[in-house]
């Protein structure tokens, strides 16, 4: 079906599931990733593809806190609505990061406001960030501006997740 790759970048452990071409489901790889070393980690982030497919459900079903990421478009808002329905169905505490934000209309932000969803951060559209990402560079290591944005975001996420999971206890 595929395989798992593991590595370390500075003090961050990274695990990636690689699905073989032609396979219909990545769920077995997700299960292997989650079963392996992840329980030993203090903080773990599981990145999922957009949408509400089985791999997304498998990834969130045992999560303590879910971070939904949406772009400021009708498609982004539609995808956000689908994933929002999933986290509600699973009863998961959650917050939203709005990505690639510009001034003006933001259907994803409107969806959050209408549904009382906590917006953790609005990351602005930025050509420099796109350049760094497309060149495989880690933005927080290359730019003090992005280090500040994402360090602040991590602090908010940890605080929010600890608060929400304490309420659920």
Give the predicted meaning of each segment:
Residues 53-74, 80:
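Inter-motif core of Ras-like GTPase G domains
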Residues 16-25, 32-56:
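Switch II (G3) loop of P-loop NTPases
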Residues 1-9:
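Cys/His-rich short segments
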Residues 76-81, 130-133:
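Short, charged, surface-exposed secondary-structure boundary motifs
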């Amino acid at each position: 079906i595929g395989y798992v790759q593991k590595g370390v970048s500075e003090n961050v452990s990274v695990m990636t599931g690689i699905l073989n071409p032609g396979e219909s489901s990545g769920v077995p790889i997700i299960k292997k990733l989650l079963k392996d070393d992840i329980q030993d980690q203090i903080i773990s982030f599981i990145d999922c593809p957009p949408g509400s497919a089985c791999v997304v459900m498998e990834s969130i079903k045992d999560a303590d806190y879910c971070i939904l990421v949406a772009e400021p478009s009708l498609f982004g808002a539609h995808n956000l609505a689908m994933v929002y329905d999933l986290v509600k169905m699973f009863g998961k505490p959650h917050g939203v990061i709005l990505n690639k934000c510009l001034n003006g209309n933001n259907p994803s932000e409107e969806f959050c406001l209408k549904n009382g969803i906590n917006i953790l951060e609005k990351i602005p559209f930025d050509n420099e960030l796109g350049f760094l990402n497309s060149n495989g560079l880690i933005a927080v290591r290359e730019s003090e501006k992005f280090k500040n944005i994402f360090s602040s975001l991590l602090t908010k996420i940890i605080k929010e997740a600890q608060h929400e999971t304490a309420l659920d206890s």
